[in-house]
Design a protein with these regions (language model features):
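Structural signature of tandem-repeat unit edges
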Residues: 2-12, 19-43, 55-125, 135-148, ...
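A short, well-ordered alpha-helical element
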Residues: 45-53
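Repeat-mediated protein-protein interaction surfaces in helical alpha-solenoids
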Residues: 265-282, 304-309
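Ankyrin repeat arrays, specifically the small/polar loop and inter-repeat linker segments at the C-terminal end
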Residues: 275-289, 314-321, 334, 344-359
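Ankyrin repeat structural motif
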Residues: 302-310, 332-341
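Ankyrin repeat A-helix N-terminal signature
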Residues: 296-302, 326-332
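Residue-level signature of the C-terminal ends
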Residues: 53, 266, 271, 300, ...
Length: 360
């Protein structure tokens, strides 16, 4: 992986471009400064950083280029337009390390090639259109730091499904800024480093904005869908779970029923600060929509999710029949076996009707 870095005032750095051959990128938190001057923490992603057609990139005389070696160490190869790698590009010593690639030989990690990004803990700013037209970006991982977002950061990122926050739900994070930049449905997972499972899973449904001008030249700004309201449940960049859960009983007819079913499922699956009243409301909706959840879980081949759904004990005979049909359609024998086993155990645990024998 090769990084183009723009030094900033205050001893920090902005990442302006990434090159490599892997669609899943884990960005470093800092790079070594030239001439042994310590390290530059990466605090910003530049405008159009991962866009296929970047605009306004700084010239080579303003940036430093780093290459990640096989041992993971970042090595400075070019500083402000000057090659500092110490390698000759044209050499007949075939045992010598290869010289740095020229710009026209580099493969940018951008656009439809990019699938996953892990942001460093040091990051504080994401520039405008950073992920513009990254149509296959499906997961973004961020740390505990608060974030400032530019405009249209995730424009046309239609495949983005998960925001993984490496923090506890009680901590102040950049989630408020992230979901505020996404109008499509997206899930946030609070998943601290080193833990086997998330602490909380929260869905943010899609919403639409409408601006209408009346004959009196008054602008009416309206929102369709509850997604906008879910995105406001933060205070000082900390999640407000009670306010989040209070939105569901207010109605969700304008929202995608499958997304709302997943919202209920994930809140019950990881019930962080979930009140009894909210739990009952989520269970009631989930009982009549288990098929929607199973459809998504089977498509993702999420066996652990199927097990979690069965553990909630919200499926009746009709739901099991629907689930068996969905598993057969998906050709998922493991899920079909799990459903059959859960149904058998539920029937065996049910109280048996009394029988009367008149054979004296």
């Amino acid at each position: 992986m090769i990084l183009d870095i723009l030094p900033l005032a205050g001893g920090t750095a902005r990442l302006v471009r990434v090159y490599g051959g892997e669609p899943c990128v884990k960005l470093p938190g800092a790079v070594p400064a030239p001439e042994g001057e310590g390290e530059w923490p990466i605090t910003e992603l530049g405008d159009y950083c991962f866009s296929e057609k970047p605009r306004g990139l700084p010239g080579p005389e303003k940036i430093c280029r780093y290459e990640r070696a096989e041992d993971g160490k970042l090595c400075l190869t070019r500083a402000f337009g000057r090659d500092v790698s110490g390698k000759e590009r044209y050499s007949f010593d075939f045992d010598a390390p290869a010289a740095p690639a020229q710009d026209d030989e580099l493969h940018p990690i951008c656009g439809n090639f990019l699938e996953e990004v892990t942001l460093p803990e040091s990051l504080r700013v994401i520039g405008s259109c950073t992920f513009y037209n990254c149509r296959r970006l499906r997961r973004l991982t961020a740390g505990t730091g608060e974030l400032t977002m530019g405009s249209d950061v995730f424009l046309n990122c239609f495949a983005l499904e998960d925001l993984v926050i490496r923090a506890t739900p009680e901590q102040a994070t950049g989630l408020f800024a992230l979901v505020g930049s996404i109008t499509e449905a997206v899930r946030a997972l609070f998943w601290p480093v080193g833990e086997a499972a998330p602490r909380a899973g929260l869905w943010y449904p899609a919403y639409w904005e409408d601006i209408e001008e009346t004959p009196a030249h008054i602008l009416l700004h309206t929102f369709s869908g509850q997604g906008y309201h879910y995105r406001q449940c933060f205070l000082e960049n900390k999640l407000l779970p009670a306010e989040y859960d209070a939105i569901f009983p207010q109605g969700h007819d304008a929202d995608d029923a499958s997304v709302m079913a997943m919202l209920c499922f994930d809140r019950l699956r990881w019930p962080w600060q979930l009140s009894d009243a909210a739990r009952d409301a989520y269970r009631d909706f989930l009982k009549t929509n288990t098929g929607r959840v199973l459809t998504r879980l089977l498509k993702a081949q999420d066996t652990e999710g199927v097990k979690a759904l069965l553990a909630l004990d919200v499926m009746d005979a009709d739901a099991f029949a629907e689930g068996a049909a969905l598993a057969a359609k998906a050709d998922n024998a493991e899920a079909a076996a799990l459903l059959a086993d859960a149904e058998h155990k539920k029937r065996a645990a049910a109280p048996q009707k009394k029988r009367y024998d008149f054979d004296f």
